[in-house]
Design a protein with these regions (language model features):
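Histone-fold recognition with a strong bias for associated Lys/Arg-rich disordered tails
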Residues: 1-130
Length: 130
């Protein structure tokens, strides 16, 4: 994973997400880990969603529940890598960065990629977050 295109706050959130996975004894981390980390880190995501009158508490609970249900194969190691779904999201975030005209991939680019139908979640799952 090349994080040179990522904002400093996203790099910090990725480190937090890795730490969550280690704590949960996972050898990979997923979308739910990163979203929870983006809410924990000062990325601006919470404030932007609040300004859009989204129920941030519900969104956090939804992703936290998914994190609790997360299963990774293998055993915990010091090398915790993004799973396949998160890798797709991070790739798709580059497209979001271009569309949003951002200088670097940040939490908004990532969250936009997560909510793009078919990248990770179905239309029905995404509707639950609206």
């Amino acid at each position: 994973m090349n994080d040179s295109n990522y904002s400093p706050s996203l790099v910090s959130a990725l480190k937090i997400a890795r730490g969550m996975a280690l704590q949960d004894k996972h050898n990979t981390f997923g979308v739910s880990h990163l979203v929870m980390a983006m809410f924990a880190e000062n990325t601006g995501l919470k404030e932007i969603l609040s300004s859009m009158q989204k129920d941030v508490g519900y969104i956090m609970e939804w992703f936290d529940t998914h994190r609790e249900m997360y299963r990774s194969s293998g055993t915990s190691t010091e090398e915790v890598e993004p799973d396949e779904e998160l890798s797709k999201v991070l790739d798709e975030s580059e497209r979001s960065k271009i569309k949003l005209g951002a200088d670097s991939i940040d939490s908004i680019c990532v969250f936009t990629a997560i909510l793009r139908e078919g990248v990770v979640y179905s239309h029905q799952q995404i509707e639950m977050l609206d």
